Swiss-Prot record:
The protein's name: Type II secretion system protein J
Membrane topology qualifier: Single-pass membrane protein
InterPro entries (UniProt xref): N_methyl_site (IPR012902), Pilin-like (IPR045584), T2SS_protein-GspJ (IPR010055), T2SS_protein_J (IPR051621)
Record-annotated membrane-spanning stretches: 8-28
Protein's gene: outJ
Modified sites of kind N-methylphenylalanine: F8
Keyword annotations from UniProtKB, A to Z: Cell inner membrane, Cell membrane, Membrane, Methylation, Protein transport, Transmembrane, Transmembrane helix, Transport
PTM section of the record: Cleaved by prepilin peptidase.
Subcellular location: Cell inner membrane
Species this protein is from: Dickeya chrysanthemi
């Protein structure tokens, strides 16, 4: 005798739908988690690239400090807190090595640059000459974001100092301490060669 065909009961259909919905939700959560991880990784990579570019730029500048009389500063170098409209320390100096291939541009390879903290951004100031006019405004380039502190220390014949008041000599070394909101305190130390103003870099992070 032929058995009557039997369809799905309402309970079985509802159970199947519930299982399908649960699986879909789980898959969606996994996908969202993967996307969030990818976004977080991309943000971290972008941040690390920003830090690398910023500290490389500072290394190029500080490694080419030269002693040169400028606008009342015997060596063209000064560093003070709250100068240059900075929220913390600021520094200004003359550097060599400003590229001028074949001397095409009507200028030397010397350039005045500076660093300051504005808001939470470490900025680089630069002029189109080593002797800018007093009324000339510098060009401004953001270097690092998320900065909560910018401190300078100076190494001289008496060791590390919190100020540099010797107008006749460059410091033998400069420590730059940058405090970041996400990575904390990072220190770069530049050793300045007295004769040429060239500097090499040492690094410490904590």
């Amino acid at each position: 005798m032929k058995q009557p065909e039997r369809g799905f009961t309402l309970l079985e259909v509802m159970l199947a739908l519930a299982i399908f919905a649960a699986l879909s939700l789980a898959a969606s959560q996994v996908m969202n988690g993967v996307m969030r991880n990818d976004e977080a990784s991309a943000r971290k990579e972008a941040r690390l690239a920003e830090l690398q570019r910023g500290f490389s730029l500072m290394e190029r500048d500080f490694s080419q400090i030269v002693p040169r009389r400028s606008q009342g500063y015997e060596l063209g170098f000064y560093a003070e807190r709250y100068q240059l409209s900075s929220a913390d320390w600021a520094v200004s100096f003359i550097r060599n090595g400003w590229l001028n291939p074949l001397g095409i541009m009507p200028r030397s390879e010397l350039q005045r640059v500076g660093y300051r903290l504005r808001g939470d951004t470490l900025e680089r100031l630069f002029y189109d000459s080593s002797e800018p006019l007093s009324t000339q405004e510098p060009a401004v380039r953001p270097v690092l974001t998320g900065v909560t502190g910018f401190v300078l220390r100076f190494f001289g014949k008496d060791g590390w100092q919190e100020r540099w008041d010797d107008p006749a000599n460059l410091p033998q070394g400069i420590a730059i301490v940058v405090t970041l909101r996400d990575y904390g305190e990072i220190t770069r130390i530049f050793l300045i060669t007295p004769r040429y103003g060239a500097a090499t870099q040492r690094r410490s992070e904590r």
